[in-house]
Amino acid sequence: MPATPMQHPRPRAATYRVQLHAGFTFDDAAAVVGYLADLGVSHLYCSPYLQAAEGSTHGYDVVDHGRLNDELGGGGAHRRLTRRLAQAGLGQVLDIVPNHMALAGRANAWWWDVLENGPSSRYASHFDIDWDPPQHKLAATVLMPVLGDHYGRVLEAGELAVERQGGSFTVRYHEHEVPLSPRSLDALLTRAAQRSGSAELDAVAAALGRLPHAHRTDPAAVAERHHDKEVLRARLAELCGERPAVAAAIDAEVDAVNGDADALDQLLGQQNYRLAYWRTAAEELSYRRFFDIETLAGLRVEDEAVFEATHRVILRLVAEGTVDGLRVDHVDGLADPQGYLDRLSEATGDGYVVVEKILAADEELPGSWPVAGTSGYDFLNHVSRLCVDSGGAAAIRACYARFTGAGEAYPEVVHAAKLQIMREDLAAEVERLTGLLADVCEGYRRQRDHTRRELRDVLREVVAAFGVYRGYVRPGRPVTPADRAHAAAAVAGVRRRRPDIDPELMTFIGELLVLGRPGKAEADFAVRFAQVSSAVMAKGVEDTAFYRYQPLVSLNEVGGDPASLGESAGGFHQAMARMARRWPETMLTLSTHDTKRSGDVRARIGLLSELPEAWERAIAAWARRNERHKRGGWPDRNAEYLLYQTLVGAWPIDSARAGAFLQKAAREAKVHTSWTDPCAEYDDALGAFVTAVLADQGFVADLTAFLAGHRIVERGRVSSLAQTTLLLTCPGVPDLYQGTEVWDLSLVDPDNRRPVDYEARRRLLAELAGAGPEAALARGDEGGPKLWLIHRLLQHRRRHPAGFGPDSGYQPLPVTGARAAHAVAFTRTGGLAVVVPRLVTGLVTGLAGGSADLARGSADLAGGSADLAGGWAGTMVELPGGAWTDVLTGGRIDGGAVGVAAMLRRFPVAVLAREA
């Protein structure tokens, strides 16, 4: 595919992410472009907007890559949005989904064709389907796990029915509809021909029976089958229209089949799919899916034809200059991420691309990837850890263990969760991987006697021991030291944990993982292992272990480490300096559509690490009071502990939102209840507990007293302002998630996808745009300080793009004094200096609550109140020489040793620009 370079790239000051759906369309987005331009962002960052499944709320369930989503307004509305962006001088970044498609009946023409024609479909190679699985019953067949009960019961209950539309035939099961293979219709149509006496219908039936078999996949047979079936289908439709008696005879035969379970069973047995009970998906699904969602089937974008078919519209938008950048969703699901990104880079002329890549704490983004960086979770977690007190975090962990009785260390929780996911939700993926390994072992006399059960057991252990999401080996290419190290660490971990496993088999698997054995089957195994490993990590850690182990949930974020004890300012500086050197245009974020808690919620919860004793006293008292609201001891103490953290982080919150969040958390934890095996008794007890607790006026009084006594709201706001400043000044391109430009106390989706009141934000911005810090601080309850800060810093970024560009660097500034550990200070290119507080509980001691008190909080942070417990206590920052102007307050400061108190006198953070 020829390169289509991104046209006239605009300086990337900041992106603003919006979630598009039927309730927020292209035209709705166009209506807020003026506000976003006034705010100072440079790019609108859109969720996927190719045609998605009907009613999609997110766009990741694409059904047609050839057009824009009709529910968003289609091409016309998109052109209006594009014109409005151009008028405002804004660019556009688009989220794309190369890994999978939604299986939404007729809406996905490719999948419909696969169901109709099996391996002989023109699109069979578009999807990652195993046409020769270990289960012989599924040979050349796609499992369709859509039934609410066992197949035979559903069939005999009359819930399956053949339907005719013109010359096409389908089977309907409630809202599900699947096509009948044209070749399977010959007997039914032959009987109808006999009934009606139609020789022409008899000829059509015979011709359908002579169509090339679905097993034939040579190009000539595929072309013949496709051409002939369409001709015959069209003639059949004409015949039914021209001769009512023929149509009546066909419909009578359809009715007869529907009334005879044996006849219908025989017809369904001739299809290229197997209708099945939905529970079979976990163990028998024969196509790769997005995690455990069987309605999202994996695509083979490693195939150039598939890449071109899925990216044609996207690359047209890039070539036209409509789209200035791309965010690649779930890059770890692909068979060959490097190859895909190379092809995408070539097709976009080395355009701006970031990837949704979840990095482990000690993992680096592959330097060979032609991308600007990640979508920002690595930055998010550095900031979250920075705002956690290490000593307090250790105490919180001990408190959590005492409260819940949970004695397992986090690595053990992860290991157990990953094994459970592989036994249950992703058993089909493990089974397919086991089959590949068994085939490989058959070719080695020292390995061939290992049974499938043994191999399955070993594979589960190796995947569970993998410390990163996946490796990136590429057949025929050198294996990187990082991939060798990750594979070796996993194998060593299994050897320690399971000495009963054959050591020679472990060595053999370790060699396979790094392409140490030649052969296509061996290479296929290594590639498939990486894809399975990624899915298991995501489902086992993010969506299971994170909901089981939760001492301090500000750390339980995508890519985070719940067992972390925080990060020092020095560690943060090292990470940012490395980012400036290697990924200076990576995306930065604090909140996304996928975060489990917003940045503001995490800012509050992180404060608990500074209050471990007070926190333990509070939850002990709350638990005693609320014991009476439980039913038979349910919910368990882990859920109760999570509820209390959630209330601290998101207060005020009503029982509906809190209950929905706790319910989702319990289902994800998969201990007492789950999505696939819900326990109504536990679910009801949990919901009733949340409702009763929040209706208990005495408890609410205790909770609000705790929040007020420790100034959680005010201190959380100060921490949020510090984190937001880092977002807007550290190396990279900051992204603001919709609505988070003011205080946002959202939880995991769907809570974080609620409608945004843009009119209120527009009015507030208009009132504060030209105001000083005191006016902004006085609007604290409305989110004024955060909005004002973002506006000021984005305006500065737009006026001085070079100061934040790829060559702008990052240099820590020395901080000295008793409170040095509470300050983070650095420069960018020597022309911008940033000073923000961290661990603010030890600094802000005099706040009493309310909007006006946030203004006093700024003075308290600066050491301006005599009643502070030390305040900044003479803490100094060594500024480079010269005169500096505060971008936020307009105040002037001379370089050299400057007191933090002086810099933060009027606002909780300082951003200084060196005067020319």
Region roles according to the model:
Residues 93-94, 102-109, 114, 397-412, ...:
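N-terminal beta-alpha lobe that positions the nucleotide/phosphoryl donor
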Residues 1-54, 66-71, 79, 83-87, ...:
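Carbohydrate-interacting/catalytic domains
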Residues 105-180:
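Active-site region of glycoside hydrolase catalytic domains
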Residues 467:
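Active-site microenvironment for binding and transforming phosphate-containing groups
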Residues 75-93, 101, 105, 112, ...:
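Conserved, well-structured beta-alpha core segment at the onset of a catalytic domain
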Residues 99, 327-334, 778:
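Conserved short loop/turn motifs at secondary-structure junctions
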Residues 56-64, 100-130, 368-377, 753:
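Aromatic- and acidic-residue-enriched segments that line the glycan-binding/catalytic groove
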